[in-house]
Amino acid sequence: MTVLPCNAVAQMKRVLMAKISLIVNGNPVNANVDPRTLLVQFLRENLRLTGTHVGCDTSQCGACVVHLDGKAVKACTTLAVMADGHEVKTIEGLAPDGGPLHPMQEAFREHHGLQCGFCTPGMIMTAVDLVHRKGHDLSDHTIREELEGNLCRCTGYQNIVLSIAAGAKAMAKSDLA
């Protein structure tokens, strides 16, 4: 067995890094990442955007949903290198710091669409994507069907469905339609 000196291992790691350039929440980001780094890890650990949660690491719960080029994706099964050259929006990017909440965020607040809040960022990102894809007049059935990949262990979903329906209508009245 050959043992490599420590500096050789460090050099190999540098060589194996991938350079990525992307837009995150409207800001250009350039970074070197291990090609195996998940997008959720990159967002949370490298960029300190901790609103995107890791609930299952298996694409089952939806707590990690972000928008990649305007479409909802699960960041726990998306490699950071797959976002190279693309635009990512996280829950932090929906509303400006210190500014008003996004209409969907406001609807979740008004209609008590959360309890512990762990699933909420993923639910909201999924809901915004749903409105962009299906329009503002959503039936309860459509909302529930579209939420199949998002799990909540607290609320029983009724208030989440009400929140999404209200948020969809509010988005129709805003510039964020």
Could you say what each language-model-derived stretch is?
Residues 3-177:
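Signature of N-terminal electron-transfer/Fe-S-associated modules in redox systems
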